[in-house]
Amino acid sequence: MAENTMWHETLHDQFGQYFAVDNVLYHEKTDHQDLIIFENAAFGRVMALDGVVQTTERDEFIYHEMMTHVPLLAHGHAKHVLIIGGGDGAMLREVTRHKNVETITMVEIDAGVVSFCRQYLPNHNAGSYDDPRFTLVIDDGVNFVNQTHQTFDVIISDCTDPIGPGESLFTSAFYEGCKRCLNPGGIFVAQNGVCFLQQDEALDSHRKLSHYFSDVSFYQAAIPTYYGGIMTFAWATDNDAIRHLSSETIQARFHAAGLKCRYYNPAIHAAAFALPQYLHDALSAQ
């Protein structure tokens, strides 16, 4: 791809977004997918897989703070955390900020993503790959959760959209495996697309997760480069109470953790679980 051209995302057929490409840092097919990292004056370094934006330097903090701090602070005493995907290292970065976490296991199917992101997106991991609590496993996520002897308090599925390598992370086999290796009272969260445009994805996840967990819902965050509306995150647990913790409890845990965030705060935590009526209606209808 030539520099000073436009890169167009291919996620949707009828409309989309584009980025001006100031400088292509890397473009190659890995063992599993087409990966490009380029520079854009407005959003910094941008990574896309198979024609779909995965992360940008400018707005990644919103996604990663909400995927980590919501479940970890809701749980309150998570010691063992599993990240599925997350090869850019930013999810790991946010989990390492929780000093009570004792082990962090990250399962990434594509070793190339980890290698390239360490080189070209160093601010994403911010040195977290060197944290002594961290273990990297190169494996398929479905295989890992169904075979591991480890158990976890929080599982974060930082998956791509349900196409290509990410498709298996939206299956019943994956959700069943996550339930298998989740400790009692544990929490599973996963990115679930932009609900206004990808509502079927959310409904499918809700239907499948409900076979394994007693409390299944969603929470949301506005992330500019995941365009088309509010980003939806799946939430699943057997502890029905932790989705309804008091603001005082979340506030106390937030201060005790010593976190300083750019997007997440205790008020955002509570508000994120308020869902639009069209999603409530769709869930009720299925």
UniProtKB/Swiss-Prot annotation:
Binding annotation for S-methyl-5'-thioadenosine: Q33, E108, D140, G141, P165
Subcellular location(s) of the protein: Cytoplasm
Keywords: Cytoplasm, Polyamine biosynthesis, Spermidine biosynthesis, Transferase
Pathway participation: Amine and polyamine biosynthesis; spermidine biosynthesis; spermidine from putrescine: step 1/1
The keyword Transferase appears for this protein: yes
Pfam family, one: Spermine_synt_N
Record CDD domains: AdoMet_MTases
GO cellular component: cytosol
Keyword Flavoprotein among record annotations: no
GO biological process: spermidine biosynthetic process
Complex formation: Homodimer or homotetramer.
Functional description taken from the UniProt entry: Catalyzes the irreversible transfer of a propylamine group from the amino donor S-adenosylmethioninamine (decarboxy-AdoMet) to putrescine (1,4-diaminobutane) to yield spermidine.
UniProt similarity note: Belongs to the spermidine/spermine synthase family.
Protein's name according to its UniProt entry: Polyamine aminopropyltransferase
Protein species of origin: Salmonella arizonae (strain ATCC BAA-731 / CDC346-86 / RSK2980)
